[in-house]
Amino acid sequence: MARYTGSLCRLCRRESMKMFLKGTRCYTEKCAFERRKYPPGQHGHNRGKLSDYGLQLREKQKVKRIYGVMERQFKNYFEKATKMKGVTGENLLKLLERRLDNVIYRMGFAMNRRQARQLVRHGYFTVNGKKVDIPSYLVRPGDIIEIVQSGKELEIIKESLALAEQRGFPVWLEVNAEEMKGKFVRLPEREEMQLPVQEQLIVEFYSK
């Protein structure tokens, strides 16, 4: 599947928010977004007011970029969310939160979701004892995610986990840093995700 290969810092500036796409750099003064909090391009400083459609589009793009999902797959998640009980926008975010690459990032086993995808593809994780190398695999409440033995020696995982322990872990996850494994306890509530997005705009975008 196609992947974005351009500047990650440019994406944060485009969406006017820090999306933590580059790992440790995002937590330092070297972060490009901290130095230039305006959209990229010649008219970035003076970008005009967006139309309703423009606002809806930007919100969709923002969530896609946060989770590293391409358009076709994102739309599939949305269609799945519409068939679930509850609020469609919240259902969409909960589906994205269940992605294995996202869960690994949330558990602190990777600096960002991009790195988590790479680690999953290289076979460094098991779910309930079985190796899974598909980043989009949807984790279920009660699932146990563990790093394989060879992965436990990787410095990038050790460094990431150390930083995550300092920041703290999401309340819907249990992480055993010493054994390098975690449990997806339950689905997160909307307010627990701490995502500065307006998911209702995405619902409106696809409802046209």
UniProtKB/Swiss-Prot annotation:
Record bears the keyword Mitochondrion: no
Gene3D superfamilies per UniProt: Ribosomal Protein S4 Delta 41, Chain A, domain 1, RNA-binding S4 domain
Positions of the S4 RNA-binding domain: 98-161
Alphabetical UniProt keywords: Ribonucleoprotein, Ribosomal protein, RNA-binding, rRNA-binding
Transmembrane parts of this sequence: none
Record InterPro entries: Ribosomal_uS4 (IPR022801), Ribosomal_uS4_bac-type (IPR005709), Ribosomal_uS4_N (IPR001912), S4_RNA-bd (IPR002942), S4_RNA-bd_sf (IPR036986)
Biological process terms in GO annotation: ribosomal small subunit biogenesis; translation
CDD domains: S4
Cystines in this chain: none
GO CC terms, sorted: small ribosomal subunit
Pfam families on file: Ribosomal_S4, S4
UniProt-recorded Gene Ontology molecular function terms: rRNA binding; structural constituent of ribosome
Quaternary structure and interacting proteins, as annotated: Part of the 30S ribosomal subunit. Contacts protein S5. The interaction surface between S4 and S5 is involved in control of translational fidelity.
Function, in words: One of the primary rRNA binding proteins, it binds directly to 16S rRNA where it nucleates assembly of the body of the 30S subunit. With S5 and S12 plays an important role in translational accuracy.
Protein name: Small ribosomal subunit protein uS4
Organism: Thermodesulfovibrio yellowstonii (strain ATCC 51303 / DSM 11347 / YP87)
